[in-house]
From Swiss-Prot:
Residues 252-265 have a biased composition (Basic and acidic residues). Belongs to the IF-3 family. Gene3D superfamilies: Translation initiation factor 3 (IF-3), C-terminal domain, Translation initiation factor 3 (IF-3), N-terminal domain. Residues 1-32 form a transit peptide. GO terms for cellular component: mitochondrial matrix; mitochondrion. SUPFAM superfamilies: Translation initiation factor IF3, C-terminal domain, Translation initiation factor IF3, N-terminal domain. It holds the Pfam family IF3_N. PANTHER family: TRANSLATION INITIATION FACTOR IF-3, TRANSLATION INITIATION FACTOR IF-3, MITOCHONDRIAL. It comes from Bos taurus (Bovine). Residues 33-92 form a propeptide. The gene is MTIF3. This is Translation initiation factor IF-3, mitochondrial. The lineage of its organism: Eukaryota, Metazoa, Chordata, Craniata, Vertebrata. Signal peptide: none annotated.
C-alpha cells in the first residue's frame, strides 16, 4: 500500500515538473522565429504590344500583296458559282466549283483569280507554264513602272561663250536626266567678251529647251542672278497631260516650248490646253 502511494506521488511530481517546464520555457521552445519583413515583390510584368497604325498598315499591305499575287488558288474556291475562262481565253460561262475542280483534274490545269470584284468572280484555267510567263511579265512591268518619290534636281553650269560641240554634249546630258524624270537647274554665266549681247544667256536657255520640245519645258523661266552676271532656269519633264496635248498639236512644239512658262516652279503654260 505504501509502495503504491509512493509510485503515485512520484508520477504526480514528474507531471508537475513537466508542466512547470512547459509553462516557463514553452514560449521559447515552441515559438518560431519572428517573421522578417519581405521586400516588396514587383508586380508581374506582361509584355503589351504598343499601339501603332504602322503595324496595321504593314499587315494590310502584306495582305493586299498576297491577294493581288498571280498564283494558283488550288482547290480552295470560296464561291459556289464562278465565271470561268479556259487556257485559250474562251468564255466557259458560270460553273459550279465542283465542276471546275473536276475540269482541272481532267486537263491538268491550275485555277487563278482574274477579277475578284466581278459578280460572280472571274477565274481562268491556265497551265503551269502560262502562270510562269504571266508572273515574268508582271515582274517586268513592275520594274519598268516609275517609283514614286520626291523629284530630284540635277545642276549644270557653263559659260555663255561655250563652243557648239560642248553645248550639244551638255544638251544630251540634260535630255538623259529629263528622260529619267529629274529636274535640271541650268546656270549660264556671262562670258568675258565685252561685246556679248545682254540676252545671250537667256537665249541659250531657250535654245536648249527648243531641242527638247515634247519631253521638257520650263519649270522656272530664265532669271538673272548674281547681279546680272548669270542666268538661271529650271527644266522639268512634261506631265502626261502635257505630252498628250503636245502630240495633239504636232505643228507647234517648238513655239510652245519657247513661249511657255510663267516663272513659277511647277507651272509651265507651254502647251495648248
Amino acid at each position: 500500500m505504501a509502495a503504491l502511494f509512493l509510485k503515485k506521488l512520484t508520477l504526480q511530481t514528474v507531471k508537475t515538473e513537466n508542466y512547470c517546464i512547459r509553462r516557463c520555457l514553452g514560449k521559447y521552445i515552441l515559438q518560431g522565429p519572428a517573421p522578417t519583413q519581405q521586400p516588396p515583390r514587383p508586380s508581374c510584368l506582361i509584355h503589351a504590344k504598343a499601339f501603332s497604325t504602322e503595324d496595321t498598315q504593314d499587315e494590310m499591305t502584306k495582305k493586299k500583296k498576297n491577294e493581288t499575287a498571280f498564283s494558283s488558288v488550288g482547290r480552295k474556291i470560296n464561291e459556289r458559282i464562278i465565271h470561268v475562262l479556259d487556257e485559250q481565253g474562251n468564255d466557259l460561262g458560270h460553273m459550279h466549283r465542283a465542276n471546275v475542280i473536276r475540269l482541272m483534274a481532267e486537263r491538268d490545269l491550275r485555277l487563278v483569280k482574274r477579277d475578284a470584284s466581278a459578280e460572280p468572280p472571274q477565274y481562268q484555267l491556265l497551265t503551269g507554264a502560262q502562270i510562269h510567263q504571266e508572273r515574268l511579265r508582271l515582274r517586268e512591268a513592275e520594274r519598268a513602272a516609275p517609283k514614286p518619290g520626291p523629284t530630284l534636281t540635277k545642276e549644270l553650269t557653263f559659260s555663255s561663250n561655250i563652243g557648239q560641240h560642248d553645248l550639244d554634249t551638255k544638251s544630251k546630258q540634260i535630255q538623259q536626266w529629263i528622260e529619267k524624270k529629274y529636274k535640271v537647274q541650268i546656270t549660264v554665266k556671262k562670258g568675258k567678251s565685252a561685246d556679248e549681247p545682254e540676252d545671250k544667256m537667256e537665249e541659250m536657255c531657250n535654245r536648249i529647251v527648243q531641242t527638247m520640245s515634247g519631253i521638257a519645258t520650263f519649270s522656272s523661266r530664265p532669271q538673272p542672278i548674281r547681279g546680272g552676271k548669270a542666268v538661271m532656269c529650271v527644266l522639268r519633264p512634261l506631265s502626261k497631260k502635257e505630252e498628250a496635248a503636245w502630240k495633239a498639236a504636232p505643228d507647234t512644239p517648238r513655239r510652245d516650248a519657247l513661249n511657255g512658262g510663267d516663272g513659277k516652279d511647277g507651272a509651265s503654260g507651254v502647251l495648248p490646253q
